[in-house]
Swiss-Prot record:
Pathway membership: Pyrimidine metabolism; UMP biosynthesis via de novo pathway; UMP from orotate: step 1/2
Gene Ontology molecular function, alphabetical: magnesium ion binding; orotate phosphoribosyltransferase activity
Protein's UniProt name: Orotate phosphoribosyltransferase
Family: Belongs to the purine/pyrimidine phosphoribosyltransferase family. PyrE subfamily.
Gene3D superfamilies in UniProt: 3.40.50.2020
Source organism: Rhizobium johnstonii (strain DSM 114642 / LMG 32736 / 3841)
Function noted in UniProt: Catalyzes the transfer of a ribosyl phosphate group from 5-phosphoribose 1-diphosphate to orotate, leading to the formation of orotidine monophosphate (OMP).
Length: 229
């Protein structure tokens, strides 16, 4: 089903943030920080994979993703949708179905046997590929998949993350010649927390300290204090 409605961006961001709270996908633990794929320590973590277990929410989020892409990228800009191992794969399948496009998936590394393939599915050379991930912090993991697709002859000018941490600029994407699309950020989640009083004052203060200076917070709490972008 092709998307034909285009909700306001702020409404989509707020609703996704509320959905994440509703399904208990927002986690906080400053005493034992979460380790992100970037190596950063974080007092907060979003489990976007939980979205898959709630059909009404899952469908709405795919509506939001399709709306975002069609409005901001265009209706005929992609030949296929790619999901990265592992969290991006189910979302790629859902979005490809929503946009009536083929789907491929990309392994973190070649599987080491058989065809030794890193990309699974049909991707003719020159295909314009959209890469989707459930979330991204600074783009490091997404670019592993983008680089593999480009090496195999695909063209990647766009990526989408359902949730973007929003704590860094998008320089990595600009440098890699990829436009990043996203629906919500931590600021949206925090706004809902304040509105509905879901965090106490101490927790709010700790989360805001992280969002305002993420690498400094990470370095003080056992994570990396700089990123290679």
């Amino acid at each position: 089903m092709i998307q034909t409605t285009f909700p306001d961006r702020a409404v989509m961001a707020e609703l996704l943030a509320k959905m994440l709270w509703e399904i208990k996908a927002v986690h906080f633990n400053a005493a034992q920080p979460y380790k992100l794929s970037s190596g950063m320590a974080s007092p907060v973590y979003i489990d976007c994979r939980k979205l898959l277990s709630f059909p009404r929410i899952r469908s709405t989020v795919m509506d939001f993703a399709a709306s975002t892409l069609l409005r901001d990228a265009g209706f005929e800009q992609f030949d296929c949708i790619a999901g990265g191992e592992t969290a991006g794969i189910p979302f790629a399948a859902l979005l490809a179905d929503r946009l009536s496009l083929p789907m491929i998936y990309v392994r973190k590394q070649p599987k080491g046997h058989g065809r030794n393939a890193q990309i699974e599915g049909n991707m003719p050379e020159g295909s314009r590929v959209l890469v989707i991930e459930d979330l991204t912090t600074a783009g490091g993991s997404m670019f592993k998949f983008i680089d593999a697709i480009r090496a195999a002859g695909g063209i990647v000018d766009h990526g989408i993350a359902l949730f973007f941490y929003g704590i860094f600029g998008e320089e990595r994407f600009a440098d890699g010649k990829v436009r990043l699309h996203h629906i919500a950020t931590w600021r949206n989640v925090l706004a809902v927390a304040k509105e509905q009083k879901l965090f106490d004052d101490k927790t709010l203060s700790e989360v805001e300290a992280f969002l305002d200076a993420p690498l400094a917070w990470s370095g003080r709490n056992g994570g990396v204090s700089e990123l290679s972008l």
